[in-house]
């Protein structure tokens, strides 16, 4: 017999007037846990910042999670951290919403809805294009729904943003550069070796070219991987919009050793 899934009842808590929220401990993914039917979750990225897997539902969400692991201003990220119930719009009483991600930035927490640009702004359809008309109308409804969500979070004094693949590539990092960092983020170092890198950066005024940093780890098979692995740890940062090379400038991050 198939194993029966454990059902978890939502325990709503007050968020603000007209808005309730349901959360689990440690920001565990609420939607997947509650229903047990999120069968379109396609994978999980092992986040070095979180030291565990962060679930994603498709390419654009995976892109967001990977970028979150690389940008300095993102400290931690959780998938589907809460569900809110809105009773502030009479025609949409009891509307339910679950944000895709909660990110702890240096400046505070932000909830994110991750969407493809064409889901929000599809091309204007021709008169004969019935499928295009359907997508056009669906996008209008989606934008209206997200405006209601933004208003609910605004009333609760919480930050909410919608981000697309365009925004990720423009403000967070070039996808190819992010992928290179993620592909080389598993190199561990001894504390004294790490201290050598941090000390060299401090003594150089906070920045060194990549080749100088690599020279500190000549004894390992891939010195650049050791350096890039320090990015998710927020020990260093680089320009995520330029290809990584010997002359890439490595800056000290926000974590001291």
PLM region spans:
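Electrostatic, structured charged patches in enzyme active sites and in nucleic-acid/phosphate-binding
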Residues: 1-257
């Amino acid at each position: 017999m198939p194993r029966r899934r454990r059902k978890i009842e939502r325990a709503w808590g007050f968020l603000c007037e007209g808005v309730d929220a349901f959360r689990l401990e440690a920001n565990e993914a609420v939607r997947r846990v509650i229903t047990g039917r999120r069968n379109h979750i396609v994978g999980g990225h092992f986040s070095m910042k979180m030291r565990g897997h962060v679930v994603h539902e498709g390419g654009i969400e995976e892109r967001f999670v990977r970028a979150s692991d690389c940008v300095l201003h993102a400290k931690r990220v959780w998938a589907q951290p809460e569900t809110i119930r809105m009773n502030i719009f009479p025609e949409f009483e009891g509307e339910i919403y679950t944000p895709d991600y909660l990110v702890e930035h240096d400046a505070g927490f932000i909830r994110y809805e991750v969407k493809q640009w064409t889901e929000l702004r599809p091309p204007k359809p021709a008169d004969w294009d019935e499928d295009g008309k359907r997508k056009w109308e669906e996008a209008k409804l989606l934008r209206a729904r997200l405006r209601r969500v933004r208003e609910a979070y605004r009333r609760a004094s919480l930050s909410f943003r919608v981000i697309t693949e365009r925004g990720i590539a423009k403000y967070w990092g070039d996808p190819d550069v992010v992928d290179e960092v993620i592909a080389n983020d598993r190199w561990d170092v001894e504390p004294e070796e790490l201290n050598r890198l941090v000390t060299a950066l401090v003594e150089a005024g906070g920045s060194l070219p990549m080749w100088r940093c690599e020279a500190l780890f000549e004894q390992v098979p891939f010195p650049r991987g050791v350096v890039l692995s320090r990015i998710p740890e927020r020990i260093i940062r680089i320009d995520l919009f330029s290809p990584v090379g010997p002359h890439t400038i490595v800056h000290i991050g926000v974590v001291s050793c």
